[in-house]
Amino acid sequence: MENKIIYFLCTGNSCRSQMAEGWAKQYLGDEWKVYSAGIEAHGLNPNAVKAMKEVGIDISNQTSDIIDSDILNNADLVVTLCGDAADKCPMTPPHVKREHWGFDDPARAQGTEEEKWAFFQRVRDEIGNRLKEFAETGK
């Protein structure tokens, strides 16, 4: 049986979609091929790498990519993680299921370094919890 494809999209493919890709690889096992991309490619955010490392998931070798139409059109599930991606995501064929799981953008966090770091940790955990729920329930 061929693996299902899940494709996470956000604006810059630097934080949220990268963390979602890392969590999905952890939780979805061999059943899914996991990809992430952005409307633009902003590069991997060092704090996203650090936040995931803190929970034992290494995303440092993931790349920041723009949306690949081949992956998009062959995906079983496309998940947008921010309103910008939901609005600007290219049209998908009818057989591709699309869902929106909105999360705050940790790259836009304000305040002290500690406050910004806490923001990254919170969003990381929210994405992780959502992926765990999806892995357990399929929803």
UniProtKB/Swiss-Prot annotation:
Keywords: Arsenical resistance, Cytoplasm, Disulfide bond, Oxidoreductase, Redox-active center. Its main location: cytoplasm. It is found in: Cytoplasm. One of its GO terms (cellular component) is cytoplasm. It catalyses: arsenate + [thioredoxin]-dithiol + H(+) = arsenite + [thioredoxin]-disulfide + H2O. Induction: Induced by arsenate, arsenite, and antimonite. The keyword Signal does not apply. SUPFAM superfamilies: Phosphotyrosine protein phosphatases I. CDD domains: LMWP_ArsC. The active site is at C10, C82, C89. Its EC number is 1.20.4.4. Disruption phenotype: Mutant is sensitive to arsenate but is still resistant to arsenite. It comes from the Bacteria. Activity is potassium and sulfate-independent. One of its GO terms (biological process) is response to arsenic-containing substance. GO terms for molecular function: arsenate reductase (thioredoxin) activity; protein tyrosine phosphatase activity. InterPro entries: Arsenate_reductase_ArsC (IPR014064), Ptyr_pPase (IPR023485), Ptyr_pPase_sf (IPR036196). Pfam families: LMWPc. PANTHER family: ARSENATE REDUCTASE. Catalyzes the reduction of arsenate [As(V)] to arsenite [As(III)]. In vitro, can dephosphorylate para-nitrophenyl phosphate (pNPP). Monomer. Belongs to the low molecular weight phosphotyrosine protein phosphatase family. Thioredoxin-coupled ArsC subfamily. This is Arsenate reductase. It comes from Bacillus subtilis (strain 168). The lineage of its organism: Bacteria, Bacillati, Bacillota, Bacilli, Bacillales.
